[in-house]
Amino acid sequence: MQYNHTAMADTPLVSVIVPIYNEESTLLELLEEHGVVDNFRRLARADRQPPRRGPLYTDSDLYKWMEAAAWSLQVRPDAKLEAKLDELTDVILAAQEPSGYLNTWFVDERAALRWQQQVSGHELYCLGHLLQAGIAYYRSTGKRKLLDGGIRFVEYLLREFGPAPKRPLLTGHPELELALAELYRTTGDRRYLELAAYLFSGVERERLKLRERDVAYMFSGKPFTERRQLEGHAVRALYASTGAADYVLETGDEVFRRTVLRLWEDFALRKVYVTGGAGARAAGETFGEAYELPNRQAYSESCAAIAGMLFSQRLLHLTGEAKYADLMERALYNGICSGMSSDGTLYCYRNPLAAPANDRIRNPWYDTTCCPPNLQRTFTALGAYFFSTSREGVWVHFYENAELKWRLESGTGMELAVKTGMPWQGETEIGVSPQKQEEFTLFLRIPAWSLATRVEVNGQRVREPVRPGGYLALRRVWNKGDRVRVEFDMTPRRVFANPRVSEDHGKAALQRGPFIYCLEKHDNPDVDVFEVSLNGRAGLEPVRGSGALSGAILLRTEGLAYDGPLSERPLYEFQPAAPRRRVRLVFVPYYAFHDRGPADFTVWLPCVNCGR
């Protein structure tokens, strides 16, 4: 059953086990070590010491870390962490000017450059993350101080910028639009939503003398509703599209609605990696052409995978269609989880789908440090993605051990308790306990990869058809203590790309549940992972991981290797080289690549005997 407009409502953060999140991560210590916090402290000192350090957008890194910490407080109260956030709030706001302006780069000798570099200056980008941190802290603790500081900056913008005769304004890096929509939801002040509409209007292109290439790269500077495809900087384009989807959710604007749906189709059908990653080209961190999805050269920035998930989440709420949740899940368990090591101390800026051992992808620090705190705020906020409510009932989008205590649209309190082996095992039980007997619908997402799903309610198999890639609508009178059992199909399968993806033509990847797998040298020391093929006639055997991969499921299968190194063969021959030597192969989840140290790895392999 499809719902054209579900009017879903967010539920609060819920108790969810997120194994990849490490509360003891030292990211704040690294931000301190590299001067990010001192950049604020110095502005409250007469001598302006120490000198400012880092790129012009480092303010946002601290704001993102604060948002992550704020969301974690909602699930796990921590007095020490809350006191640290209060301290940082005071440090930040001590640097705010009486006008409301707040930025640690455009000060002193650079103050004259304010708003003169709107294409690349990141002033509004940093403000967006300040607002999101303030909103998160307010929702978690009720404290408004940081939020009010962000609002003062927005009020400054409203006074100074807008259509002529005011000064022109542009989001050179979209992000503020999302924050303004959330600020409107938090305060009810429609002026903030109208400011987002002004930014989407693109009316200032002439006054700002924008070049066509900048308009494409920024995904800003022309009317958003004229966009026909995702192009330019991947994170910018997806953040802009997410903000536009937020605008649709709050206004119902039909032209914006058609635009965001069109852009998502371009993304999902032509420009997203099998891992949920986005951004084919390192040059400019940009999208490529349709079906341009290289593997070793893939940029696939961690922030872009996060942005893609955010965009899909908004459209899930707009439409109630499971395809958006499917893409969210693909990104989360693959292209997002790969961005952080399992111990939470190493990060990926880019996430290629193949790389040699000498490609240093995971690092503790980057000069551009947008991804680490973005990953942290994503993981600490995950509980908000698992459930939604609507007039009809409750929606379950993802399955992890979680508890929801919330209320139906009627006001009746209810609890859901999910106990599951997911994402590794398919057995799932959902306890449904309304405070009083009530009729409503429980919408269960059936992932597209689960081709044969069994569902029972109180021991009786449901009669409704259970289709992959949709929501199963269980409408009934629910009573306290009702139990829903779901068995998802965890059969490992080969995945094939659209033939237009030239780099993956004749190749296959492996998937089990939500996880995409890769072949890594650590587990296949006697095989050149770049010169081996899958055997389409061989079985795919799930096996339990050990050591650093304890708790994970690996895949074992048979492959076919060449008799000798391909480097010793002629460049051109009259007969094709054929792999014939049988070898055992072990695949690990993609998110774990280089987690045990650098090693050759690849996701896509040539597939012999792989007729569909």
Where are these regions (language model features)?
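N-proximal low-complexity "stem/linker" segments adjacent to membrane-targeting elements
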Residues: 1-28
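C-terminal beta-rich recognition modules with glycine/proline-rich loops and embedded aromatic residues
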Residues: 196, 260, 326-334, 339-431, ...
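Hydrophobic core segments within long, regular secondary-structure runs in both alpha-
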Residues: 66, 82-96, 128-131, 147-158, ...
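Aromatic-lined, polymer-binding surfaces characteristic
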Residues: 98-101, 122-139, 146-185, 233, ...
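Well-ordered alpha-helical scaffold segments within catalytic/enzyme domains
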Residues: 64-79, 128-143, 176-188, 239-254, ...
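Solvent-exposed loop and edge beta-strand segments that line ligand/cofactor-binding
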Residues: 46-62, 112-126, 143, 159-173, ...
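Low-complexity, Ser/Thr/Pro/Gly-enriched N-terminal "stalk/linker" regions
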Residues: 29-61, 80, 86-106
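Beta-strand-rich binding/interaction modules
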Residues: 437-458
